[in-house]
Regions:
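N-terminal secretory signal peptides and thylakoid transit peptides that target proteins
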Residues: 1-19
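Sec/Tat-exported extracytoplasmic proteins
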Residues: 85-93, 131, 148-152
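Stable alpha-helical elements in mature extracytoplasmic
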Residues: 77-85, 123, 140-144
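C-terminal segment of N-terminal export signals and the immediately downstream linker at the start
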Residues: 25-43
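Mid-length scaffold segments of soluble, non-membrane domains
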Residues: 92-97, 103-135
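Catalytic cores and adjacent binding grooves of peptidoglycan-active enzymes
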Residues: 116-122, 134-198
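Cleavable N-terminal signal peptides
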Residues: 18-20, 29-30
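Active-site acidic/histidine clusters and adjacent loop/turn architecture
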Residues: 39-93
Length: 198
């Protein structure tokens, strides 16, 4: 069903999710979300906060093939899902130009108990972070909502927050969440199927 939108989405196929970043997984303690508020070691969604400069970091600058853009995000399944999301936004909502995507950011005390903390774990990104509120037309919002449905609640949008930020998209699940793993696998399989079709 998801493959039937725009003709130029066919172009996505060869670039999807054969992620240029290597696949690494990390498993925080089961109570990561609670620990987040105590020691700032985890972002709000339960992923370890990291710094790309660290030798053991799983945050890398990942090319989002097909749209000539890149951003720093967590490699592996997070990259699989978020890169797919960016391409859907590019081809189905509005063209994304180089430099319009922002990924990992260093943790801040102000953001630690908000969805913005997910940027510090490499599990979130912002598309046009400087754009004004209510920049999307109603039909574009409808398409964004359709795109998000395919991720089965694993990806959340800042446009739905009380203090909305339409630029923000983030993983809304912990690393060990079975649905997160299922959705990542679904996206991976679908993308390879697209490559074979074309």
């Amino acid at each position: 069903v998801f493959l039937k939108y725009l003709d130029r989405r066919q172009f996505i196929a060869g670039s999807l999710t054969v992620a240029i970043c290597s696949v690494v997984s990390s498993q925080p303690p089961a109570q990561a979300s609670q620990l987040n508020q105590d020691n700032y070691e985890f972002s709000l969604n339960g992923w370890p906060v990291q710094n790309p400069a660290d030798e053991v970091s799983t945050i890398e600058k990942c090319d989002i093939s097909g749209i000539s853009s890149s951003c720093e995000m967590r490699i592996g399944d997070v990259n699989i899902i978020l890169s797919d999301l960016v391409r859907q936004m590019h081809y189905r909502v509005k063209d994304i130009k180089p430099g319009e995507i922002s990924g990992w950011k260093a943790k801040t005390e102000e953001a630690i108990q908000t969805p913005y903390s997910n940027l510090s774990s490499g599990t979130a990104l912002q598309i046009r972070p400087s754009m004004p509120i209510d920049s999307y037309f109603a039909y574009e919002i409808k398409i964004i909502q359709e795109v998000l449905k395919d991720y089965e609640g694993i990806v959340s949008w800042g446009g739905d927050m009380t203090n909305k930020d339409e630029s923000l998209f983030y993983i809304n699940a912990s690393p060990e969440d079975p649905l997160f793993l299922e959705v990542a696998e679904k996206v991976r399989v679908r993308n390879f199927a697209d490559v074979r079709i074309n």
